[in-house]
């Protein structure tokens, strides 16, 4: 069958020694000039001319295809299966050669993502989540608190409504793929020609492109804004806990929903207390005479203020007193306890008078001392 020879240089109106930049400029000018939407009265002729321009650019923009065209006058398909004179099995050579040509596995092309679906750029996608860290005081966990924050996020472009298209301009068929959403690739090897299809990188597989990109967002459909928001911190959150604010993240793509704002809460350490779940531990040191005779001490509370704790006579070192409901809020709002750990200080040095009083007391009680 005789091949139809076409002068691709003549179709694009460029000389045979034209640079890639000259070819690209000619192509862009011609696809705009001959787009079928611009010739409703001669649409059929325009479509044919448009396809020829597309075909010419497809060949001349590819160095390998252009070299073959310059040499043979056409770019066509040859039988793929030829006798291999290399070591190893025939199919191993085929697979190896295929990978060298396309830079990907043969199964990825024929059975993977490239063959099974069309990856569209302009489908609605959810926006990204944004992560933000807030620090709170221990006292903020008693009744909860509200903290104002300020952060940057992408919002839906108010000019184009997220479409990325300049208002009133609309869409046109993709000039690169001719509206099909697919690009056909031919690669030559010593086995012959391999032909594959891939998603058009110009339109993302949709077959159409904006006639004019939005002047405000540049076609992304999103604009960066600084926003303010008040975050409500619940009373029972743990250190390192997370809060999810639905819709507080970045705007979606092409009408997709907003992502979420994820807050990580860090509780500042309080030197007065140690945490044990919902309980708080407070250490206090009293004099040995207070432990013997009893006393009343002032205990700070995590929410602020103080309470009085009565230490009974004869309190032993490391005695723990439990103040119920004075800890941190737990499930259903029930608070943990405040545990007061009493340390007793024994003096290392005594005055002569103090020592005599204690020696007399020991003698009366029959306690041997040094």
Swiss-Prot record:
Zinc fingers (CR-type) by residue: 144-226
Alphabetical list of SUPFAM superfamilies matching this protein: Chaperone J-domain (SSF46565), DnaJ/Hsp40 cysteine-rich domain (SSF57938), HSP40/DnaJ peptide-binding domain (SSF49493)
Cofactors demanded by this protein: Zn(2+)
Family per similarity comment: Belongs to the DnaJ family.
Listed SMART domains: DnaJ
Leader sequence residues: none
UniProt-listed Pfam families: DnaJ, DnaJ_C, DnaJ_CXXCXGXG
Name the UniProt record assigns to this protein: Chaperone protein DnaJ
Transmembrane segments: none
Gene name of the encoded protein: dnaJ
GO cellular component: cytoplasm
Domain characteristics, as noted in the entry: The J domain is necessary and sufficient to stimulate DnaK ATPase activity. Zinc center 1 plays an important role in the autonomous, DnaK-independent chaperone activity of DnaJ. Zinc center 2 is essential for interaction with DnaK and for DnaJ activity.
Manner of cofactor binding, per the entry note: Binds 2 Zn(2+) ions per monomer.
Keywords assigned by UniProt, alphabetized: Chaperone, Cytoplasm, DNA replication, Metal-binding, Repeat, Stress response, Zinc, Zinc-finger
A biological-process GO annotation: chaperone cofactor-dependent protein refolding
Residue sites binding Zn(2+) 2 per the record: 174, 177, 200, 203
Annotated CXXCXGXG motif repeat ranges: 157-164, 174-181, 200-207, 214-221
Function (record text): Participates actively in the response to hyperosmotic and heat shock by preventing the aggregation of stress-denatured proteins and by disaggregating proteins, also in an autonomous, DnaK-independent fashion. Unfolded proteins bind initially to DnaJ; upon interaction with the DnaJ-bound protein, DnaK hydrolyzes its bound ATP, resulting in the formation of a stable complex. GrpE releases ADP from DnaK; ATP binding to DnaK triggers the release of the substrate protein, thus completing the reaction cycle.
Domain J span(s) in chain numbering: 7-73
Complex and partners: Homodimer.
Localisation: Cytoplasm
């Amino acid at each position: 069958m005789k091949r139809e020879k076409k002068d691709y240089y003549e179709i694009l109106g460029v000389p045979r020694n034209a640079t890639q930049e000259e070819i690209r400029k000619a192509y862009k000018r011609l696809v705009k000039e001959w787009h079928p939407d611009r010739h409703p009265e001669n649409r059929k002729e325009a479509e044919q001319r448009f396809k020829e321009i597309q075909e010419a650019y497809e060949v001349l923009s590819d160095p390998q295809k252009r070299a073959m065209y310059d040499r043979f006058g056409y770019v066509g398909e040859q039988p793929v299966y030829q006798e291999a004179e290399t070591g190893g099995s025939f199919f191993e050579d085929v697979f190896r050669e295929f990978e060298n040509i396309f830079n990907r596995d043969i199964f990825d092309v024929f059975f993977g993502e490239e063959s099974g679906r069309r990856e569209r750029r302009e489908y609605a996608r959810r926006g990204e989540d944004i992560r933000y860290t807030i620090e709170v005081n221990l006292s903020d966990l008693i009744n909860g608190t509200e903290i104002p924050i300020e952060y940057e996020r992408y919002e839906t472009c108010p000019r184009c409504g997220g479409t990325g298209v300049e208002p009133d301009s609309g869409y046109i068929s993709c000039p690169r793929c001719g509206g099909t959403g697919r690009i056909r690739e031919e690669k030559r090897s010593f086995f012959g020609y391999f032909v594959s299809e891939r998603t058009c990188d110009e339109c993302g597989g949709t077959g159409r492109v904006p006639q004019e990109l939005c002047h405000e967002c540049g076609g992304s459909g999103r604009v960066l804004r600084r926003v303010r928001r008040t975050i409500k911190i619940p009373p029972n959150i743990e250190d390192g806990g997370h809060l999810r604010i639905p819709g507080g993240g970045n705007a979606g793509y092409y009408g997709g929903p907003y992502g979420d704002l994820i807050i990580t809460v860090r509780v500042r350490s309080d030197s007065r207390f140690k945490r044990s779940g919902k309980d708080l531990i407070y250490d206090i040191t009293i004099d040995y005479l207070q432990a013997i005779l009893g006393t009343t001490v002032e205990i700070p509370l995590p929410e602020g203020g103080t309470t009085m704790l009565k230490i009974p006579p004869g309190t032993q070192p490391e005695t723990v007193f439990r103040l119920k409901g004075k800890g941190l809020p737990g499930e259903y709002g029930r608070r943990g306890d405040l545990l007061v750990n009493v340390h007793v200080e024994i003096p290392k040095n005594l005055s002569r008078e103090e020592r005599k009083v204690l020696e007399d007391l020991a003698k009366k009680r029959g306690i041997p001392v040094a």
